[in-house]
């Protein structure tokens, strides 16, 4: 997870608010969407897995000033086209806070905890159509499934979007 988070740190340290808020054309989400969406979803996923309160709250919204105070999972592309990050430095602080918490949790997790079922079968409609439902075993989505799908795989997917979108603003990718 730390290596994947490192890609996000590399990306954010080589961009500014102009880059992340750029809209290439209608239907193409700004980098701001992918950055905030993924970070906020990792924050929310942590809550679903551990029961701990998310980092994101009204205070963080006042600091970061995203234009759409929502991760956007259940919104349309048209709605999320409006996503912008108002204070990019504060966003980077929020991201670091979320990622540090996840990494600290993973560093101390009891391996037996990885088998605990987070969402049992049968899955609700919102879950049944997800990648994690495909990965889940007969009992449902375990902590390991959730961390792999909701955090790691999801993070890499959005990093791919970010690397492509960086080319739209004259920046390159970070890996080969």
Label each region the model flagged.
Residues 81-95:
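A short, structured beta-strand-centered segment in the mid-to-C-terminal lobe
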Residues 106-116:
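Proline-centered turn/helix-capping motifs that create local helix->coil transitions or kinks
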Residues 75, 79-80:
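Phosphate/pyrophosphate-binding loop motifs in nucleotide- or prenyl diphosphate-using proteins
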Residues 17:
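Short alpha-helical DNA-recognition segment
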Residues 2, 9, 20-74, 100-103, ...:
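Short, contiguous alpha-helical
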């Amino acid at each position: 997870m730390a290596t994947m988070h490192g890609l996000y740190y590399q990306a954010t340290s080589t961009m500014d608010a102009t880059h992340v808020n750029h809209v290439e054309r209608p239907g193409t989400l700004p980098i701001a969407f992918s950055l905030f969406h993924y970070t906020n979803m990792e924050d929310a996923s942590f809550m679903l897995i551990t029961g701990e309160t998310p980092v994101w709250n009204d205070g963080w919204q006042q600091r970061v000033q995203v234009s759409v105070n929502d991760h956007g999972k259940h919104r349309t592309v048209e709605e999320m086209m409006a996503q912008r990050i108002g204070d990019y430095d504060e966003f980077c602080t929020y991201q670091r806070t979320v990622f540090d918490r996840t990494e600290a949790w993973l560093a101390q997790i009891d391996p037996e905890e990885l088998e605990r079922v987070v969402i049992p079968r049968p899955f609700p409609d919102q879950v049944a159509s997800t990648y994690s439902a495909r990965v889940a075993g007969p009992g449902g989505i375990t902590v390991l499934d959730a961390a792999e799908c909701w955090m790691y795989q999801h993070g890499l997917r959005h990093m791919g979007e970010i690397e492509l979108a960086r080319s739209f603003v004259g920046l390159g990718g970070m890996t080969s």
